[in-house]
Amino acid sequence: MEWSLTQSKLLAFHRLMRTDKPIGALLLLWPTLWALWVATPGMPQLWILAVFVAGVWLMRAAGCVVNDYADRKFDGHVKRTVNRPLPSGAVTEKEARNLFVVLVLLAFLLVMTLNVMTILLSVAALALAWVYPFMKRYTHLPQVVLGAAFGWSIPMAFAAVSESLPLSCWLMFLANILWAVAYDTQYAMVDRDDDIKIGIKSTAILFGRYDKLIIGILQLGVMALMALIGWLNGLGGGYYWAVLVAGALFAYQQKLIANREREACFKAFMNNNYVGLVLFLGLAMSYWHF
């Protein structure tokens, strides 16, 4: 019986950290890899790459824990989240707080192996991860904070590789914010009706009937900024083909969200994994030396 309870608790932690749903970690991973490849340029040192990949998974898990902790009183009223570990009682509030601390400490131990500039920037990463979940109570723009949180690995990657934060770093950071607002608005469209009832704010609610148009404008902005990064760094034609493929994926997402159906909006959100992958492959191939 004791082992059964332990198994049950571990499974609850697994669900709380969303390790069974890697999409969030992947959306955090791709911009991190973009930054590492542009900053190097090309393949970064294996240890730096390992630190950032592990850090992405740890901080995404920590972000999920603090997000569910912040939303624990709301999630019980939303159909999609009612069975999450905290509202269902599978994990206690104290256990969630302790798990968050452990994950953050592990991530910080990894960052401590890098240079001072990266360590200092990591403090802002922690602050953004902690603040984001609470923003949806006070502003209709929590997706902007999410974009900054998911994109903060970009200046950290540049700092770790080159100890500098050039123009390309901040253009990529801005591109990631636009991209995050676009895809998280798609995600928020799934819960829009429930969020309105319980008082949660989001860009999906703020944009209203202009949601599809604004998402499209944001997606065009992502393409323009990523193309500009390619030009500034002298990337080859293959990279621009990758940007165009990303544009085709954005067009497909627009088709999916056309009728604002919940399942289709969620499918559009999930499709953004391929946008990040395609752009990374374009960068990696541009820096590949045969």
Swiss-Prot record:
Enzyme class, spelled out: transferase
**What are the record keywords, sorted?**
Cell inner membrane, Cell membrane, Magnesium, Membrane, Transferase, Transmembrane, Transmembrane helix, Ubiquinone biosynthesis
Q: Which InterPro entries match?
A: HB_polyprenyltransferase-like, Prenyltransferase, UbiA_prenyltransferase, UbiA_prenylTrfase_CS, UbiA_sf
The listed locations are: Cell inner membrane
Question: Which reaction(s) are listed as its catalytic activity?
Answer: all-trans-octaprenyl diphosphate + 4-hydroxybenzoate = 4-hydroxy-3-(all-trans-octaprenyl)benzoate + diphosphate
One GO cellular-component annotation of the UniProt record comes to: plasma membrane
This protein's pathway: Cofactor biosynthesis; ubiquinone biosynthesis
**Biological processes annotated in GO:** ubiquinone biosynthetic process
Topology of the protein relative to the lipid bilayer: Multi-pass membrane protein
Q: Which PROSITE patterns match?
A: UBIA (PS00943)
CDD domains registered for this protein in UniProt: PT_UbiA_COQ2 (cd13959)
Its needed co-factors are:
Mg(2+)
Q: Quote the EC number.
A: 2.5.1.39
Any keyword Membrane? yes
Give TM regions: 23-43, 46-66, 99-119, 141-161, 163-183, 213-233, 234-254, 268-288
Q: Name one GO molecular function term.
A: 4-hydroxybenzoate polyprenyltransferase activity
Q: Which HAMAP family match?
A: UbiA (MF_01635)
Functional summary from the UniProt entry = Catalyzes the prenylation of para-hydroxybenzoate (PHB) with an all-trans polyprenyl group. Mediates the second step in the final reaction sequence of ubiquinone-8 (UQ-8) biosynthesis, which is the condensation of the polyisoprenoid side chain with PHB, generating the first membrane-bound Q intermediate 3-octaprenyl-4-hydroxybenzoate.
Q: Which family does it belong to?
A: Belongs to the UbiA prenyltransferase family.
Official protein name in the record: 4-hydroxybenzoate octaprenyltransferase
What gene does this protein come from? ubiA
